[in-house]
Amino acid sequence: MSIFLNKDSKVIVQGITGGEGTKHTARMLAAGTQIVGGVNARKAGTTVSHVDANGAAVELPVFATVAEAMAATGADVSVAFVPPAFTKDASIEAIDAGIGLLVIITEGVPVKDSAELWAHAKATGNNTRIIGPNCPGIITPGEAL
């Protein structure tokens, strides 16, 4: 039984084209997580190639915004692998889009930025659950990573 993440969760990766995003997307796919795309405004309209848990090649679309990714894929979870300087804006974008769960992996996020993104989430009232910043991720054994 999962609390936040399960085999049916549709996950987008903010920062999918960066080094950490690329590495961890591969690991999540290998664990069976249903990654449905990524977000990078500068690389929107492209795809990234990976291999899923069954060894099959997958092409993941890259979108300009979280809202666009959610509309196209039905994503309900976002995991953020963005540099600390961009974490607040990326998080607020996901919150404003109404993502159900936001997992912020990034470490070194300024405390002020963390406080502001949490205050923004509370003010919107859209019930986005946030784990992080500076989080090692979440796992539901046998279902998703």
Identify the function of each model-found stretch:
Residues 1-8, 67, 142-145:
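A short, basic/flexible loop-to-alpha-helix module at the beginning of a structural domain
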Residues 13, 37-40, 62, 104, ...:
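General beta-strand structural signal in soluble alpha/beta enzymes
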Residues 17:
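N-terminal Rossmann NAD(P)H-binding glycine-rich loop of SDR-like oxidoreductase domains
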Residues 21-22, 87:
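N-terminal Rossmann-fold NAD(P) dinucleotide-binding loop
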Residues 25, 66, 91-95:
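Generic hydrophobic/aromatic pocket-lining and core-packing "Φ" positions
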Residues 29-55, 133:
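NAD(P)-binding Rossmann-fold cofactor-contacting core
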Residues 71-77, 81, 85-108:
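Rossmann-fold NAD(P) dinucleotide-binding segment
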Residues 107-131:
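Rossmann-fold NAD(P)-binding glycine/threonine-rich loop
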